[in-house]
């Protein structure tokens, strides 16, 4: 007889309480499609800082909001875009050009292999 998997869920607030300043955080979604906005809002609400954000493969509004809120120190992504809405995400562009965040821009293949190597 096969044992059924037990559901494992956690409240969003509790999940984000396990994240500390300076940690590396991964977010999924693609551009502005299906980003985990409830998690993003909670990270901002809890005032986390200096995060390294592995987002993508192509990051979007979730990354831009975290950057604009001052939560991010480094972004690892193939790009941060709002596509037809605004092109390059505005907070990303401003913070990257001014040197307020560091950026490891890598194509999707390198992004994928780096994640796989770290697993």
Language-model-derived ranges and their functions:
Residues 2-119:
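Conserved alpha/beta enzyme-core scaffold
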């Amino acid at each position: 007889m096969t044992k059924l998997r037990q559901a494992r869920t956690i409240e969003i607030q509790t999940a984000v309480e396990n994240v500390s300043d300076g940690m590396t955080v991964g977010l999924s979604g693609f551009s502005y499609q299906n980003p985990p906005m409830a998690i993003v809002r909670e990270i901002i609400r809890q005032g986390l800082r200096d995060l390294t954000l592995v987002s993508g493969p192509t990051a979007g509004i979730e990354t831009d909001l975290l950057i604009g809120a001052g939560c991010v120190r480094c972004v690892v992504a193939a790009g941060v875009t709002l596509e037809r809405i605004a092109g390059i995400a505005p907070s990303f562009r401003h913070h990257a050009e001014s040197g307020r965040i560091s950026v490891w821009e890598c194509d999707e293949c390198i992004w994928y292999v780096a994640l796989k190597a770290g697993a």
